[in-house]
Amino acid sequence: MSMLRLQKRLASSVLRCGKKKVWLDPNETNEIANANSRQQIRKLIKDGLIIRKPVTVHSRARCRKNTLARRKGRHMGIGKRKGTANARMPEKVTWMRRMRILRRLLRRYRESKKIDRHMYHSLYLKVKGNVFKNKRILMEHIHKLKADKARKKLLADQAEARRSKTKEARKRREERLQAKKEEIIKTLSKEEETKK
């Protein structure tokens, strides 16, 4: 059996693949051995004596299955961990994500006129100062602030109404007293006139 090293090299060059991927027909070795140019190799490829082997399957099914399991939290216990908690999920990244979420919420609330710019600024600084652990707590805080503001406004309005009411009542009382005084003075003056 002759060595077909040259033919294999030429075939790999023509087929544009590695020498491992070239299949030479073992029943037609003599004919293949006679081919010593690229043109002849091309003819043999056309005839089917030289074939490019298909790509070996490297399945990712198991890998996909494991990835899905890891998303559920499987294979992620203490025994599987190599790095520190900070190496696996950096605190800085967690902080940045939280800041972006909370600041986005504040911006959205300000744009939709749910909070005014003064409240926005004070809450922004509180967010920066690590007051709110997550979005839910910030939203609850905003609702509470708004409720307190509304309650204060209501109480102020009620107090104002009460003040204006007492003012009106005092004014009416003074007017009545004044009218009574005038009446008494009139009657007294009439009596004095009749006596004379």
Curated annotation (Swiss-Prot):
Covalent crosslink: Glycyl lysine isopeptide (Lys-Gly) (interchain with G-Cter in SUMO1): 181
Protein's job: Component of the large ribosomal subunit. The ribosome is a large ribonucleoprotein complex responsible for the synthesis of proteins in the cell.
List of residues that carry Phosphothreonine: 187
Gene3D superfamilies xrefs: 1.10.1200.240, 1.10.1650.10
Post-translational modification, as annotated: Citrullinated by PADI4.
Gene: RPL19
Any GO BP annotation: cytoplasmic translation
Protein name per Swiss-Prot or TrEMBL: Large ribosomal subunit protein eL19
Record's compositionally biased regions (Basic and acidic residues): 159-176
Keyword check for Cell membrane: no
One GO location term (cellular component): synapse
Modified sites of kind Phosphoserine: 13, 164
Keywords (A to Z) from UniProt: Citrullination, Cytoplasm, Isopeptide bond, Phosphoprotein, Ribonucleoprotein, Ribosomal protein, Ubl conjugation
Coarse class of the protein's main subcellular location: cytoplasm
Subcellular location: Cytoplasm
InterPro entries, alphabetized: 60S_ribosomal_eL19_sf, Ribosomal_eL19, Ribosomal_eL19_CS, Ribosomal_eL19_dom, Ribosomal_eL19_dom1, Ribosomal_eL19_euk
The protein's assembly and partners: Component of the large ribosomal subunit.
Alphabetical list of CDD domains matching this protein: Ribosomal_L19e_E
Disordered as annotated region, ranges: 157-176
Single annotated GO MF: structural constituent of ribosome
Modified residues (Citrulline): 5, 16, 38
SMART domains: Ribosomal_L19e
Similarity annotation: Belongs to the eukaryotic ribosomal protein eL19 family.
